[in-house]
A protein has these predicted regions:
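CheY-like receiver
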Residues: 114, 121-137
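Active-site beta3 strand of CheY-like receiver
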Residues: 47-58
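Short amphipathic alpha-helix used as the core "switch/output" element in two-component signaling
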Residues: 42, 62-77
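His-Asp phosphorelay/catalytic-motif detector in bacterial-type signaling
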Residues: 3, 48-50, 73-79
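Two-component/phosphorelay signaling modules centered on CheY-like receiver
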Residues: 12-32, 37
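C-terminal output helix
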Residues: 89, 107-117, 124
């Protein structure tokens, strides 16, 4: 789904710059950027992105796991985690938070695109499945 609007939540400026360049080259629009979970929640409300790319380890009081739970619960926007931590415990926490996928840092364009497209497709399928009972009634 090219042209998808993506919110980047990352507290390392160099990673934000790299993500912006890569997302643009892949045909995505960067809706906004945020560096904390609080900023991310405000940005989701304001910019209504199609997907959130969120670092698990963020500055501030709330980490990306907590942010993802709030975003999924309140806004029903898919979250794909960015992480340098591929250990089992971190991945389990990401799955429990309702993540639609994850991208390991340093990321590749192909890996980023695959994670985004998979998450968007999975999210669209969820929406269609929620509507299915309405059509049967």
């Amino acid at each position: 789904m090219t042209n998808a609007r993506i919110l980047i939540v990352e507290d390392e400026a160099i990673t934000v710059s790299a993500l912006k360049r890569e997302l643009a080259s892949l045909g995505y629009e960067v809706a906004a950027t945020a560096s904390t979970t609080d900023e991310a929640l405000n940005a989701v409300e304001l910019h209504k992105p199609d997907l959130v790319l969120m670092d698990i380890t963020l500055a501030g009081n709330l980490n990306g796991i907590v942010g993802a739970v709030a975003i999924r619960g309140n806004y029903h926007v898919p979250v794909v985690f960015l992480t340098a931590h591929a250990d089992d415990q971190t991945m389990e926490r990401a799955v429990t938070a309702g993540a639609f996928g994850y991208v390991l840092k340093p990321f590749s364009g192909a890996g980023l695109k695959a994670a985004i497209e998979t998450a968007l497709h999975k999210h669209q399928t969820e929406i269609e499945n929620r509507r299915a009972p309405d059509r049967a009634a």
